[in-house]
């Protein structure tokens, strides 16, 4: 398998070569774009059509939005979720809630973050001063970053305002 070959080359400290490197990078980019959601993967394998894959991923994101509205009728949960790409693009040390939800109390924000985490649509990465001493004793609940649980959905969410995630991204 490719994995066994890469492991063998890595262990022996031999380069993989340009051809294999290009193939692995193409496969990696493909995974980053399609993601791992079974419906999106199946659509890609059956059709090899990125437009159809993008439609599937947009449908999944719409289902997430519907679920968020059931959990939080104010729409704040959806705002926090939709802002993840912009927040990560800022390259800030943490998710800046105040730029998404101004004038909200910290305890209500923490409840919303807990709801997002429980929905299993995002991963929460908390800041810790000393992770060696045990994360639970050192994590700062007010300093965190949010990441989508699926890279393909993240790519589609980044371009949510477009009708279709641009072909140029898929064709690189």
Language model features: what each stretch is:
Residues 41-172:
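Accessory nucleic acid-recognition modules appended to NTPase machines
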Residues 1-39:
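Amphipathic alpha-helical segments of the small helical/lid subdomains adjacent to P-loop NTPase cores
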